[in-house]
């Protein structure tokens, strides 16, 4: 299995269990997810022991929480955040500087294509700003990557967009 981590925060962003494709001329990875409903905290009554009818009225016992959301977000503990268009512009400017500095250090040949492609991609993001939900890694590092969540034209299929150069690949 391959885990994709944010290179700044080291948070796990997604893994290769999803359908992943390169978009924006290889600048971004688009990861397709599914809407899921999960029950958390539910414990099988047979594991508790005792006779439920002899214990008195129901009410005590275990509580279950039902969570509905995008599987990528739930599985990798991504945290929703919000931006105004202006605050996103400020964030993305600082984020691009951080990624550019990292590329200059590790992959200098990627700097020019990244900066050229990023400018185009940011224009596209800002033009469709109202369509996106924003997610950060589990540690909520404000300097880390912000993933974008949108839905396909069918209105049902969620997908997330990640800047490829902001990710590190870890093989498990």
Curated annotation (Swiss-Prot):
<dbReference type="Pfam" id="PF00838">
    <property type="entry name" value="TCTP"/>
</dbReference>
<dbReference type="InterPro" id="IPR018105">
    <property type="entry name" value="Translational_control_tumour_p"/>
</dbReference>
<dbReference type="InterPro" id="IPR011057">
    <property type="entry name" value="Mss4-like_sf"/>
</dbReference>
<keyword id="KW-0597">Phosphoprotein</keyword>
<dbReference type="GO" id="GO:0005615">
    <property type="term" value="C:extracellular space"/>
</dbReference>
<feature type="domain" description="TCTP">
    <location>
        <begin position="1"/>
        <end position="172"/>
    </location>
</feature>
<dbReference type="InterPro" id="IPR018103">
    <property type="entry name" value="Translation_control_tumour_CS"/>
</dbReference>
<dbReference type="GO" id="GO:0005737">
    <property type="term" value="C:cytoplasm"/>
</dbReference>
<dbReference type="GO" id="GO:0005771">
    <property type="term" value="C:multivesicular body"/>
</dbReference>
<comment type="function">
    <text>Involved in calcium binding and microtubule stabilization.</text>
</comment>
<dbReference type="GO" id="GO:0000922">
    <property type="term" value="C:spindle pole"/>
</dbReference>
<dbReference type="InterPro" id="IPR034737">
    <property type="entry name" value="TCTP"/>
</dbReference>
<feature type="modified residue" description="Phosphoserine; by PLK1">
    <location>
        <position position="46"/>
    </location>
</feature>
<keyword id="KW-0963">Cytoplasm</keyword>
<comment type="similarity">
    <text>Belongs to the TCTP family.</text>
</comment>
<dbReference type="GO" id="GO:0005509">
    <property type="term" value="F:calcium ion binding"/>
</dbReference>
<keyword id="KW-0106">Calcium</keyword>
<dbReference type="InterPro" id="IPR011323">
    <property type="entry name" value="Mss4/transl-control_tumour"/>
</dbReference>
<protein>
    <recommendedName>
        <fullName>Translationally-controlled tumor protein homolog</fullName>
    </recommendedName>
</protein>
<dbReference type="GO" id="GO:0005881">
    <property type="term" value="C:cytoplasmic microtubule"/>
</dbReference>
